[in-house]
A protein has these predicted regions:
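ABC ATPase NBD coupling module
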Residues: 62-79, 103-106, 110-116
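Glycine/charge-rich catalytic "coupling/switch" loops of P-loop NTPases
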Residues: 266-313, 331, 335-363
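Internal alpha/beta loop-helix hairpins
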Residues: 182, 186, 196-265
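Conserved ABC ATPase signature
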Residues: 135-139, 143
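Conserved ABC ATPase "signature" region
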Residues: 61-64, 111-131, 182-183
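A short, proline-enriched helix->beta-strand linker immediately N-terminal to the Walker B motif
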Residues: 154-158
């Protein structure tokens, strides 16, 4: 587990939070610009001046103001990946990777052996073996970030910090690096704090989520639960939707479709070449869900889920509301007009049919 109790006071900003985060997987730190995301990472790394509180990673205490403990950054077992790759331009990829291991390579033979093994593992995990002899200016943005991540994990850190690592990449390069980050998440048995303001990155990569706004924690928890809490900034706007974990339950070869089964029903989506039993994540956006009070007949919408209304909450626009639906163990969002809610006489607890017009495979 990660235990964070952090307080940073500035003239125009205050970061004050207390968190307990999982000891494995990706925790997304989400929020608008100026919410304190990067300040949180810098505090964990020991880079913020005058920070107070307690930082404990597993059994290791990195900071405890009351006990007078505050380890300098170089004594904290962490890897840090920034928006820009920060590779040394005069060194090749291989030389950049080895540069970070100099301290370990000066130690005992056993430490040297372990360091070399970790370096080779990071090269394989990030798929950069063919890039080792290239110079940084010969790499694409996505390749540079993969090298930077490999350099960070080669030191076998207890904690990996990533500060918007995809922010400087164009859409094509972001899509290129997503699978590598997912592999990293699944292969490493360490916690990762991942700062982002991208809902796509959250849904594709994160296991846990913290929502920050103006230096305060607005929500935290498993990502699928946080994404359906209508009081959170993350569900405001066109990106509002549910993240559902399931598996491929069946294939329809004739129509090139795959069925995704989950605790609450199933939906059909276009075949992505996945095999039956494969674990997947799907996203259903609130704007793609409509409701009916009886089972729809003679409709082109193929995905229909039995549900009950959990809540009806005003949306930022006065013409709309956000409806939270319970589908078995899962929650689904639907953005409707107030007129539709009035005409259908929808109310909390009412059974309905949710018609899902579109499903996105995110992982």
């Amino acid at each position: 587990m990660i235990h964070l109790q952090i307080k940073i006071l500035r003239s125009a900003f205050e970061l004050k939070l207390e968190l307990q985060l999982p000891g494995q997987g990706i925790t997304a730190i989400f929020g608008p610009s100026g919410s304190g995301k990067t300040s949180l990472l810098r505090a964990v790394a020991g880079l913020e001046k005058n920070q107070q509180g307690r930082i404990q990673i597993g059994a290791n205490i990195w900071q405890d103001t009351r006990q007078g403990i505050c380890l300098p950054t170089w004594q904290r077992s962490l890897g840090y990946v920034f928006q820009e790759s920060s590779l040394l331009p005069h060194l090749s990829v291989a030389e950049n990777l080895n540069f970070g291991l100099k301290r370990a390579l000066k130690s005992s033979n056993s430490v040297q052996t372990e360091a070399n093994k970790a370096l080779q593992a990071s090269i394989e995990l990030l798929g950069i073996g063919s890039l080792l002899q290239r110079m940084p200016d010969e790499l694409s943005g996505g390749e540079r970030q993969r090298v930077a991540i490999a350099r960070a994990i080669a030191m076998q850190p207890q904690l990996l910090l990533m500060d918007e690592p995809l922010a400087s990449l164009d859409a094509a390069r972001r899509q290129e690096i997503f699978p590598w980050l997912a592999s990293l998440r699944d292969a490493l048995k360490i916690p990762m704090l991942y700062v982002t303001h991208s809902a796509e990155e959250v849904t594709r990569l994160a296991d846990h989520m913290v929502v920050l706004d103006k230096g305060q924690v607005k929500a935290q928890g498993p990502v699928n639960q946080v994404l359906t809490q209508v009081v959170n900034p993350v569900v405001v706007g066109e990106d509002a939707g549910a993240l559902i974990a399931g598996h491929i339950g069946a294939l329809d070869a004739q129509w090139h479709l795959s069925r995704v089964d989950f605790e609450g029903g199933f939906v059909w989506m276009r075949d992505a070449g996945l095999t039956v039993g494969k674990a997947v994540r799907i996203r259903i956006l609130a704007r793609d869900v409509s409701l009916a009070t009886s089972e729809p007949q003679n409709t082109s919408i193929q995905n229909q889920l039995m549900a009950s209304i959990q809540s009806i909450t005003p949306d930022p626009h006065p013409s709309q509301v956000m409806v939270v639906l319970k589908c078995g163990a899962e929650e689904v969002l639907a953005r409707l007009t107030k007129r539709a809610v009035n005409e259908l006489a929808l109310e909390v607890g009412m059974p309905v049919w949710a018609q899902v017009k579109s499903v996105a495979l995110v992982a």
